[in-house]
C-alpha cells in the first residue's frame, strides 16, 4: 500500500522547495543529496513528505540509540497505517570475546540479549521482506553482520485453510526455523500443542497464531492476543517466518562443517610451522569441540564466527547485513550525517584490532575476521540512493552530493538565537542568575561543559540554589539518557548539564537558554560544527538565547557566530516580508519506547557486576582493586547506590589483603 502521511500541518517555510528539490533529485537518479536544514526547520517532516512522494522502502540510519528512538516515535506518528520499524543492537550488556597477550588473559564473550529489541529487529526484517511501505529506523547496527536473507526467504512455512498437513512433520519444520516447544503461554519463539490446536508465538509480531485442525486438515486460523487470548483476526492463509536472525538448513551445516575442518587443518599447520605448538593445540581443541556441537545440535557458542562457511563466502567478502534484505530501489537517509559518516567509517577497524589477537594466539580461526561490520566502501556499494541530513554536513557529504538543499526558514517563523560572549570570570554566578530568570518564565536551560566531572559537580552546585538539575554524559546508558531528557521536557527538572551529548538532534522546544562554558577552549568539543549544533538547541523557542563564556573569540567561535548571524538575517527578512511572528514549537512528549526494557535493568547490572567480581582470578590484586574502584564510582554516578556499596565492600576486602601482604 502507499504511504499515508498523517499530520495536522502542511509544509511551510523552506520545506516545500526542499521536498520538491529532493524528490526531483531522486527521480532524476541522483545518488547522493544533502538536506542542510537548520535546527528546528522540520527536517524530519521534510523527510516524511519525501518518503510519501516517492513511495519506496526506506532505511534511516541514526548515530545513536537515543536519536533513533526519537526518530522512530516521530515516524510512527506520521505513518500510523504503514510499517515503521526499529533496528538497534539487542544487547543490554555485551562483553566481546578478547585476548590480552601482555597478561595472558582470555575474556570470554558475555552478553545479555534484550528480548523486546530482538523482537523489534525480527519484525523489521519480516516487514522489509514482505512489504514496500516500510520505514526502518536504525543505528549503525544496520552495517553489522546479519543472517542470510535467502534463508529467511526460503525457510518459511506457508499455510492456508483446507490444506492437509502431517502434524509431526510440521512440528519438525517449526523446530528447524528456530521455534521451541514450550508449555508457557505466550513465550516468544515458542509453540505449544493442545489436542487439535496448535499455538505459535513468533518473534516478529506481538500477536500469537492459533491453528485449529480437523484430522489432518487445517480447519481455522486466527491471530490472537497473547495476554487475554481474544481472537484478533481470522486468516485464510499465512506465512510463518523464522524466529531468529540466524537460521540455516541441514545441508548448509554439513557443508560448513567440512569447510571449517579444512580451514582448521590449514591453520594448525601454519601455526606449527611458526613454532606455535601451544596455539595450534588450543585452536584444534576449541574448534573440534565447536564442530562436534554443530554436527549434533546445529549450534555452538560463537557460531557467528563461522558465518562465512555457512554463507559460502570467500575470505574477505562482505557479510550479509540488514541492507541485503531490501529491494534495490530502497532509499537511505543518514541522519546527523556529520557524525554518522565517521562512525560508519570507524566500525570495521575497531572490530579487526580485537580479533587479531584471537586469531594469532589460537582462540579463533581466521574466518572470524569475516564476521564483522561492513567497510565504508562496502556500505556505499550496497546503497542505491542516499540523502544526508544535517545542520552541519561534513566535507564528505558536500563533496559527493549532486545537490545540497538548504532549509533555513522555519515553519514557525523562529529565528536563530542571539549569541552573547561573556567573560569566564564569575561565569557560574552569572549562569545561576540567568537560569533563575529562565525558571521564572517556566522555560528550561541546557549547559554544556568540557568534562564529565564538571557536569556532575555543576549539576550538584545548581541544586543548592533550588534549581532542579541533572547531568547527561556518555556513561549514562541509552535508557537513562532518554529518561533525563524526558524529565526536562515534562517539567520535572529545570536544567540539564552535559558534555558533547547536548549537540546532536535533541528536540527540546522548552529550552530557551544554552550556556557554553569555556567556549574558547580549542578542541573538537568547541569546533565550529559543534558550536553551531549547540547553538541550535535553543532555536525551537521564541526566547532563545545563547551565552558563550570566553575570554577571547577563537576562529571556530567567530565562524559559528557569523554563520548564525547569516541565518538570522535570512530568517528575519523572510518574516518581515511575510508578516510572520515567531512562536515557540508546541510538541507532545515522545513515546517512551524503552519502557518495556526497564524490568531487565536490575538483572543486567547484577550479571555485569558478577562478571567483574569473577575477574579476581585473572588479575593481580592491584589491578583488581583499581577495576573495583572505577566500577564503584561509575555505579554511584548512575545512582545505583546498592551496587556501588557491593563493589565498595569487595574493594575493602582486597585492600585489607594488600595491606597484609
From Swiss-Prot:
GO molecular function: ATP binding; ATP hydrolysis activity; DNA binding; excinuclease ABC activity; helicase activity
Residues noted as binding ATP in the record, renumbered to the chain: 37-44
Motif Beta-hairpin per record, residues: 90-113
Pfam families to which the protein is assigned, alphabetical: Helicase_C, ResIII, UVR, UvrB, UvrB_inter
Stretches assigned to the Helicase C-terminal domain: 430-594
Main location, first listed in the record: cytoplasm
Domain (UVR) ranges: 622-657
GO terms classed as biological process: nucleotide-excision repair; SOS response
Sorted UniProt keywords: ATP-binding, Cytoplasm, DNA damage, DNA excision, DNA repair, Excision nuclease, Helicase, Hydrolase, Nucleotide-binding, SOS response
CDD domains for this protein: DEXHc_UvrB (cd17916), SF2_C_UvrB (cd18790)
Location relative to the cell: Cytoplasm
Domain Helicase ATP-binding: 24-209
UniProt similarity note: Belongs to the UvrB family.
Record text about domains: The beta-hairpin motif is involved in DNA binding.
Function: The UvrABC repair system catalyzes the recognition and processing of DNA lesions. A damage recognition complex composed of 2 UvrA and 2 UvrB subunits scans DNA for abnormalities. Upon binding of the UvrA(2)B(2) complex to a putative damaged site, the DNA wraps around one UvrB monomer. DNA wrap is dependent on ATP binding by UvrB and probably causes local melting of the DNA helix, facilitating insertion of UvrB beta-hairpin between the DNA strands. Then UvrB probes one DNA strand for the presence of a lesion.
NCBIfam families: PRK05298.1, uvrb
Complex formation: Forms a heterotetramer with UvrA during the search for lesions. Interacts with UvrC in an incision complex.
Protein name: UvrABC system protein B
Species, as recorded: Fervidobacterium nodosum (strain ATCC 35602 / DSM 5306 / Rt17-B1)
Gene coding for it: uvrB
Amino acid at each position: 500500500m502507499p504511504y499515508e502521511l498523517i499530520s495536522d500541518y502542511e509544509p511551510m517555510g523552506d520545506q516545500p522547495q526542499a521536498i520538491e528539490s529532493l524528490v526531483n533529485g531522486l527521480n532524476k537518479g541522483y545518488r547522493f543529496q544533502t538536506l542542510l536544514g537548520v535546527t528546528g526547520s522540520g527536517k524530519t517532516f521534510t523527510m516524511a513528505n519525501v518518503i510519501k512522494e516517492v513511495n519506496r522502502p526506506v532505511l534511516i540510519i541514526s548515530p545513536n540509540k537515543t536519536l533513533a528512538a526519537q526518530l522512530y516515535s516521530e515516524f510512527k506518528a506520521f505513518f500510523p497505517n504503514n510499517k515503521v520499524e526499529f533496528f538497534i543492537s539487542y544487547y543490554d550488556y555485551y562483553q566481546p570475546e578478547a585476548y590480552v597477550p601482555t597478561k595472558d588473559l582470555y575474556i570470554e564473550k558475555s552478553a545479555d540479549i534484550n528480548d523486546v529489541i530482538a523482537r523489534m529487529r525480527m519484525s523489521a526484517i519480516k516487514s522489509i521482506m514482505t512489504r514496500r511501505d516500510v520505514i526502518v529506523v536504525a543505528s549503525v547496527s544496520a552495517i553489522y553482520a546479519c543472517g542470510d536473507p535467502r534463508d529467511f526467504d526460503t525457510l518459511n512455512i506457508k499455510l492456508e485453510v483446507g490444506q492437509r498437513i502431517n502434524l509431526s512433520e510440521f512440528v519438525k519444520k517449526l523446530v528447524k526455523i528456530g521455534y521451541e516447544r514450550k508449555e508457557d503461554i505466550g513465550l516468544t519463539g515458542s509453540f505449544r500443542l493442545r489436542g487439535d490446536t496448535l499455538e505459535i508465538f513468533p518473534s516478529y509480531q506481538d500477536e500469537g497464531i492459533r491453528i485449529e485442525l480437523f484430522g489432518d486438515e487445517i480447519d481455522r486460523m486466527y491471530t490472537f492476543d497473547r495476554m487475554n487470548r481474544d481472537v484478533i483476526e481470522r486468516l485464510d492463509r499465512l506465512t510463518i517466518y523464522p524466529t531468529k536472525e540466524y537460521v540455516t538448513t541441514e545441508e548448509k551445516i554439513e557443508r560448513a562443517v567440512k569447510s571449517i575442518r579444512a580451514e582448521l587443518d590449514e591453520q594448525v599447520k601454519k601455526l606449527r610451522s611458526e613454532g606455535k605448538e601451544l596455539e595450534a593445540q588450543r585452536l584444534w581443541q576449541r574448534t573440534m569441540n565447536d564442530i562436534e556441537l554443530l554436527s549434533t545440535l546445529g549450534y555452538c557458542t560463537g557460531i557467528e564466527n563461522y558465518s562465512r562457511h555457512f554463507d559460502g563466502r570467500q575470505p574477505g567478502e562482505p557479510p550479509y547485513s540488514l541492507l541485503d534484505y531490501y529491494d534495490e530501489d530502497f532509499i537511505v537517509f543518514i541522519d546527523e550525517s556529520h557524525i554518522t559518516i565517521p562512525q560508519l567509517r570507524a566500525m570495521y577497524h575497531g572490530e579487526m584490532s580485537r580479533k587479531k589477537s584471537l586469531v594469532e594466539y589460537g582462540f579463533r580461526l581466521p574466518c572470524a575476521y569475516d564476521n564483522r561490520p561492513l567497510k565504508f566502501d562496502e556500505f556505499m556499494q550496497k546503497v542505491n540512493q542516499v540523502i544526508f541530513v544535517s545542520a552541519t554536513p561534513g566535507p564528505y557529504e558536500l563533496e559527493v552530493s549532486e545537490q545540497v538543499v538548504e532549509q533555513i526558514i522555519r515553519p514557525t517563523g523562529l529565528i536563530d538565537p542571539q549569541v552573547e560572549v561573556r567573560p569566564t570570570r564569575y561565569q557560574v554566578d552569572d549562569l545561576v542568575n540567568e537560569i533563575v530568570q529562565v525558571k521564572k518564565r517556566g522555560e528550561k536551560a541546557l549547559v554544556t561543559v568540557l568534562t564529565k566531572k564538571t557536569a556532575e559537580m555543576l549539576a550538584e552546585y545548581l541544586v543548592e540554589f533550588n534549581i532542579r538539575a541533572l547531568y547527561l554524559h556518555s556513561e549514562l546508558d541509552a535508557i537513562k539518557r532518554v529518561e533525563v531528557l524526558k524529565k526536562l521536557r515534562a517539567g520535572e527538572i529545570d536544567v540539564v548539564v552535559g558534555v558533547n551529548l547536548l549537540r546532536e538532534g535533541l528536540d527540546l522546544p522548552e529550552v530557551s537558554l544554552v550556556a557554553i562554558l569555556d567556549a574558547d577552549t580549542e578542541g573538537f568539543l568547541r569546533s565550529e560544527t559543534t558550536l553551531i549544533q549547540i547553538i541550535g538547541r535553543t532555536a525551537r523557542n521564541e526566547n532563545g538565547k545563547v551565552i558563550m563564556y570566553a575570554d577571547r573569540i577563537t576562529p571556530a567561535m567567530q565562524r559559528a557566530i557569523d554563520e548564525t548571524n547569516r541565518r538570522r538575517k535570512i530568517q528575519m527578512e523572510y518574516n518581515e516580508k511575510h508578516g510572520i511572528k515567531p512562536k515557540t514549537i508546541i510538541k507532545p512528549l515522545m513515546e517512551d519506547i524503552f519502557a518495556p526494557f526497564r524490568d531487565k535493568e536490575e538483572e543486567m547490572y547484577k550479571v555485569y557486576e558478577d562478571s567483574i567480581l569473577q575477574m579476581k582470578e585473572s588479575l593481580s590484586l592491584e589491578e583488581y582493586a583499581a577495576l573495583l574502584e572505577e566500577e564503584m564510582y561509575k555505579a554511584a554516578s548512575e545512582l545505583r547506590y546498592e551496587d556501588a556499596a557491593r563493589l565498595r565492600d569487595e574493594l575493602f576486602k582486597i585492600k585489607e589483603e594488600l595491606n597484609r601482604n
